Amino acid sequence: MKKTLAALIVGAFAASAANAAVVYNNEGTNVELGGRLSIIAEQSNSTVDNQKQQHGALRNQGSRFHIKATHNFGDGFYAQGYLETRFVTKASENGSDNFGDITSKYAYVTLGNKAFGEVKLGRAKTIADGITSAEDKEYGVLNNSDYIPTSGNTVGYTFKGIDGLVLGANYLLAQKREGAKGENKRPNDKAGEVRIGEINNGIQVGAKYDANDIVAKIAYGRTNYKYNESDEHKQQLNGVLATLGYRFSDLGLLVSLDSGYAKTKNYKIKHEKRYFVSPGFQYELMEDTNVYGNFKYERTSVDQGEKTREQAVLFGVDHKLHKQLLTYIEGAYARTRTTETGKGVKTEKEKSVGVGLRVYF
């Protein structure tokens, strides 16, 4: 019998939890190790940098390792520590194909209660993460972080006491600061100060509802970035992300519409506005095989200046060979038209296709 999409989603979470290995479980303390090794073979072509030939690569695609320790105090109270590492070196550096240096992607502690919610402190995802419904494995065409940061150095609160509903709020703190002289310090920047162009602080609030075949999510964020050497001059980003979707459970089909709007207020220069809309779908073609895709239209404009319009499409198919083995093929195409006063119209195109394999552990 064909599974419903809701059952697939529940099963996916269960499988994710099952992939982690419990290495210690005693007196209310549980320690899990898990992760995945991901490889992708791809062909890509872009006119952005006047590239004329296709480039092929075999590289890392988001391989990761995590350790999670949870201690239950009783009466629904718990504490949790989480650490996740990633590979960060670019393929163009040292011929590493993205399997170079290892860094901490997320590192945080959580204090919570099943009835009252939880407080999370550290480098973690924010409530803005997972707002949009579009599915992708590698070539996602939605740039959510241009609207609201989806992770960072944060203090956050999340409430999950109502079935299907998640409420959350985050306060973002500066994460990237200048080092001392001789330690990658930029000219004219003060050691210990926030780097120019990086997050100074910010706030986010959001709500996510996913039940009764309805998906509705929305988040708002106000983020301040350091603009120049003066601590008083900031670049402020106000953004909204939202999604609305419906599951046709009997058909194994999810249809959704993602959207976003943002306005960037710059010090002494023209402000910038952007928005996007993106219809998408996810369909269970057969057991353990899914088809997904989405289209995006995005427009960016500077007051009385440059205007950019981007159209992009993504399509993919994934198949679970085993509960811990996933393979997929995915492709994306994007065309960007930039209009600037006195310079005419410039068109840029990008296309990529890849075949990937993920082994979970």
UniProtKB/Swiss-Prot annotation:
Cited function: Forms pores that allow passive diffusion of small molecules across the outer membrane.
Main location per the UniProt record: membrane
Family label: Belongs to the Gram-negative porin family.
Protein location: Cell outer membrane
Membrane topology, record value: Multi-pass membrane protein
GO-annotated cellular components: cell outer membrane; pore complex
UniProt KW keywords: Cell outer membrane, Ion transport, Membrane, Porin, Signal, Transmembrane, Transmembrane beta strand, Transport
Organism: Haemophilus influenzae
One GO biological process term: monoatomic ion transport
Pfam families per the UniProt record, alphabetical: Porin_4
Protein name as annotated: Outer membrane protein P2
Record has Heme as a keyword: no
Signal peptide: 1-20
Record InterPro entries: Gram-neg_bact_OMP (IPR050298), Gram_neg_porin_domain (IPR033900), Porin_dom_sf (IPR023614)
Molecular function via GO: porin activity
Assembly and binders: Homotrimer.
